[in-house]
Amino acid sequence: MSEKFDCHYCRDPLQGKKYVQKDGRHCCLKCFDKFCANTCVECRKPISADAKEVHYKNRYWHDTCFRCAKCLHPLASETFVSKDGKILCNKCATREDSPRCKGCFKAIVAGDQNVEYKGTIWHKDCFTCSNCKQVIGTGSFFPKGEDFYCVTCHETKFAKHCVKCNKAITSGGITYQDQPWHAECFVCVTCSKKLAGQRFTAVEDQYYCVDCYKNFVAKKCAGCKNPITGFGKGSSVVAYEGQSWHDYCFHCKKCSVNLANKRFVFHNEQVYCPDCAKKL
């Protein structure tokens, strides 16, 4: 008499039927799905005996459920990467390890044009001016805190403007009486000589180099007839009755004693000491 060939679970005869042998036991397909089948970690349904199964590190999937966690590309017949419990295709795994753009927060992968500044990175087209929103890319820019400005917007928003030409001072420049100038704009009003770092004289908001001030502006000493410049020797001036003298030229017409800061007598457009004036 032949041995019974029945399902281990439901005892239905298996003769002439499809069955599965598991752990030395025979079972019909229905009981296999109910009692023996692995559960797909993706869809949570049993992986039936006639379905294709993918197995990786004690986890099981239907072959159609085994996809990249990012792009959902099927991976049953392709290489893949396991990262932090997620199954990824090679392309998405590379992106996961790539730095993120500060602008769009997307991955910057090999071959992407990018801009890096102080450890932060952007796609080239994501690196834009905080004011006009135009792409700065690899062009010149000015950082201000967390913001970045193109040259034009920085000049408009932050740069000092020259009091003469009213254009932005982007580098260098000088300050005189709390007013900013381009070095090339701060010049002698007569000869256009640059005055930065040079001696000059201001007269009614006009600026003169030493030579032009001497020749065209300075008063002439009533004694020596030379210009009174205020530079070097003779910087002290004596003024009286609309006339001016170098302090060293202000002396008695007769005895030549210097009268700067002393009593004197002015007679017939001439200067005398008191003693000589008595003898006139």
UniProtKB/Swiss-Prot annotation:
GO molecular function: transmembrane transporter binding; zinc ion binding
One GO term (biological process): negative regulation of G1/S transition of mitotic cell cycle
Role, per record: May have an involvement in muscle development or hypertrophy. Isoform 2 binds to RBP-J and plays a negative regulatory role in the RBP-J-mediated transcription in mammalian systems.
Domain LIM zinc-binding, chain residue ranges per copy: 40-92, 101-153, 162-212, 221-276
Organism domain of life: Eukaryota
Cellular compartment(s): Cytoplasm
InterPro entries according to UniProt: Fhl1 (IPR042997), LIM_FHL1/2/3/5_N (IPR056807), Znf_LIM (IPR001781)
Gene Ontology terms: cellular component: cytoplasm; nucleus; plasma membrane
Endpoints of the signal sequence: none
Name of this protein: Four and a half LIM domains protein 1
Zinc finger annotations (C4-type) as residue ranges: 7-31
Entries under SMART domains matching the protein: LIM
PANTHER family reported in the protein's UniProt record: FOUR AND A HALF LIM DOMAINS PROTEIN 1 (PTHR47029:SF2)
Key word Glycoprotein present: no
Modified-residue entries (N-acetylserine), positions: S2
UniProt crosslink position (Glycyl lysine isopeptide (Lys-Gly) (interchain with G-Cter in SUMO2)): K86
Modified residues (N6-acetyllysine): K4
Keyword tags: Acetylation, Cytoplasm, Developmental protein, Differentiation, Isopeptide bond, LIM domain, Metal-binding, Repeat, Ubl conjugation, Zinc, Zinc-finger
Cystines in this chain: none
SUPFAM superfamilies: Glucocorticoid receptor-like (DNA-binding domain)
